[in-house]
């Protein structure tokens, strides 16, 4: 074995030890529990959440423990891989931080008294569910959706906690459904538009678009138009940001998504075009075998990609 091969082999062994270390896994969960508690108690003091400061922290930590147990039982492979743990809980932390930052921004002088309404419409509720669904699959995205919905409701005031909880759950579930139909990165914009529409519908139901619930008061068309734009734009921007950071996450965590596989299968790919010229027989034979494999996978319900 050459020196280069030995160095590469030892590097892989070192990475595997880190990835499978129970000690590092436990440290990751403890760090997230501490960060989560700090984030919630800090925000709860400012905004007057639905529970007392320590009550909110207690609820967050209990749901975290329940979530970790669920994660261990239903996703043992991801649970035992520290890279996946860091990815999932890191995305959830970013999701919660974005919610907190959005409400901190809209509570300033720019938006005035209507800040909370725009904060609700601008919330990137699709961030973690959409990211995890594309990267790791639907089952783990549902897990993330439920936890982010509960924790997100603890970051806002009493008036917003239930609307945000309900909306986050529905948006997350829709994200899980939409990712199955997203085959190219360009399809992310369409998914973002659909998510924006859902945000708009819930904004109308809870009175965050017009400032009053349906049937209450006079319709303010200016507020309605602005609310529609904010809701749709929020959904499109959130999903577009997810699409922009996906290649970096895939590269860093060594994950290949369905979108990446489909892009590699593009017949205009330079390697495939070169193959059609230099080895046309092999090229056509490969296409036939690939089509047969895809049909077989679809027949047994496996992932054809």
Regions found by a protein language model. Give the residues of each.
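Alpha-helical transmembrane segments of polytopic membrane proteins
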Residues: 51-62, 115-122, 164-165, 226-236
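Membrane-embedded alpha-helical signal segments
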Residues: 1-90, 132, 277-300, 305
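Active-site-adjacent structural elements in folded domains
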Residues: 112-116, 275-276
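Alpha-helix N-cap/helix-initiation motif
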Residues: 117-121, 159-163, 167, 278, ...
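Short helix-perturbing small/polar motifs within transmembrane alpha-helices
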Residues: 19-24, 35-42, 63-112, 129-139, ...
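Acidic/His-rich, divalent-metal-binding segments that scaffold phosphate/diphosphate chemistry
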Residues: 143-147, 165, 188-206, 210, ...
């Amino acid at each position: 074995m050459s020196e280069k091969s030995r160095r590469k082999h030892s590097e892989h062994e070192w990475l595997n030890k880190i990835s499978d270390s129970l000690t590092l896994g436990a440290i990751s969960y403890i760090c997230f529990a501490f960060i989560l508690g700090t984030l919630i108690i800090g925000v709860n003091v400012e905004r007057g959440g639905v529970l007392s400061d320590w009550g909110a922290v207690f609820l967050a930590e209990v749901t975290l423990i329940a979530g970790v147990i669920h994660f261990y039982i239903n996703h043992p492979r991801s649970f035992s891989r520290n890279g996946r743990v860091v990815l999932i809980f890191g995305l959830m932390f970013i999701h919660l931080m974005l919610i907190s930052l959005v409400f901190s921004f809209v509570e300033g002088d720019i938006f005035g008294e209507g800040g909370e309404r725009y904060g609700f419409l601008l919330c990137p509720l699709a961030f973690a569910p959409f990211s995890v669904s594309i990267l790791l699959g639907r089952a783990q995205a549902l897990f993330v959706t439920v936890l982010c919905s509960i924790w997100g409701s603890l970051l806002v005031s009493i008036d917003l906690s239930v609307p945000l909880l309900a909306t986050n759950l529905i948006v997350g579930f829709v994200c899980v459904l939409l990712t199955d139909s997203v085959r190219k990165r360009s399809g992310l914009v369409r998914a973002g538009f659909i998510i924006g529409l859902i945000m708009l519908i819930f904004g109308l139901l809870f009175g965050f678009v017009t400032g009053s619930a349906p049937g209450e008061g006079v319709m303010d068309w200016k507020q309605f138009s602005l609310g529609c734009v904010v809701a749709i734009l929020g959904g499109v921007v959130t999903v577009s940001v997810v699409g922009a950071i996906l290649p970096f996450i895939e590269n860093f965590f060594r994950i290949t998504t369905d979108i990446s596989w489909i892009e590699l299968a593009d017949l205009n790919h330079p390697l495939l075009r070169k193959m059609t010229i230099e080895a046309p027989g092999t090229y056509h034979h490969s296409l036939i075998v690939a089509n047969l494999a895809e049909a077989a996978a679809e027949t047994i319900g496996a992932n054809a990609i």
